[in-house]
Design a protein with these regions (language model features):
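Alpha-helical lid/collar subdomain of P-loop NTPases
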Residues: 165-170, 174-271
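AAA+ P-loop NTPase catalytic core and its hallmark functional loops
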Residues: 1-186, 190, 194
Length: 271
């Protein structure tokens, strides 16, 4: 990411959900005092949304049609770090618009306006994805699609962001759970992270199809504060999202970490 900022490289960050891909870029940009704009490339983002469109405006009491620039032309002309989240979920027609600016000196041509935009010297481009552009083989990321390899070739750097070391993850989770202080709560959070790591190993080995991200651990801690019960908060945060066939395996992970048995017949009341 730092190489992207310093040397104007196009950087793509790939990793599982909840690893902090976008946050990582945002925090580095904040420490560099570099303005950062995030665009979520869901399937409803269109070419018009990115490039701009004609809009009706009032001028001296009269309606006139005026071109309104989208976020892409605006970002290119400013010292901005533009981050495309969920890059592998973008529509093909939108991806080809982005392809124009993937080259470092790539100019953006607005055909409707007969205008060519030169990128600002401090414009930077990043993307975050769950896959590496080859489609989703795990079944975890429905809605993602294969990315044109001609476009993938234009990204200068592709880095994978894995889950943190448990000691580092503990610091991150503790910083987000200010209301859970003290050694007793710290030990509980350590075991939460231990359980999360067991689900990640189980997923990697093909034993289970869902895993706990740091985001899930933080949500569990927040729900534990609300419900004052480890099992209830765990059920409501994670276990209820899992396949019934796999719940016994995940319950075993829980027992291993907390020495508490979970009754899989009770998955948390809706009330």
């Amino acid at each position: 990411i730092l190489a992207g900022f310093e040397h104007n490289r196009r950087v793509m960050i790939q990793g599982f959900h909840g690893t902090g891909k976008s946050t990582h870029i945002e925090q580095i940009a904040a420490r560099l005092n570099w303005p950062c704009v995030r665009i979520n490339l869901d399937s409803h983002i269109s070419r018009i949304d990115l490039l701009g469109k004609d809009a009706i405006k009032l001028n001296d009491g009269k309606q006139i049609t005026e071109f309104q620039e989208g976020l892409l032309p605006w970002s290119i002309q400013n010292p901005v770090a533009l981050v495309f989240d969920e890059y592998d979920a973008g529509r093909p027609d939108v991806m080809f618009v982005i392809q124009r600016i993937l080259e470092v000196e790539g100019k953006l041509t607005l055909l409707d306006q007969n205008k060519i935009i030169n990128p600002h010297s401090s414009f930077r481009l990043f993307a975050t994805t769950n896959t590496v552009g080859l489609g989703d083989m795990t079944g975890l990321y429905h809605g993602t699609q294969q990315i044109n390899q001609g476009q993938m070739d234009r990204w200068h750097i592709l880095s994978t962001l894995n889950y943190l070391d448990p000691s580092q993850e503990l610091k991150v989770v503790m910083s987000k759970l200010n209301n859970l202080k003290g050694e007793k709560n710290k030990e509980i959070i350590k075991n939460m992270i231990k359980l999360a790591n067991l689900t990640r190993v189980g997923f990697a080995n093909g034993d289970i199809s869902t895993l706990m991200s740091p985001r899930t651990v933080i949500s569990w801690g927040q729900n534990f504060k609300i419900f004052k019960d480890l099992v209830t908060s765990f059920n409501l945060t994670f276990l209820n999202k899992c396949d019934d066939i796999e719940k016994s395996i995940i319950s075993e992970y829980f027992q291993r970490c907390f020495d508490i048995e979970i009754d899989n017949g009770e998955s948390g009341s809706a009330s």
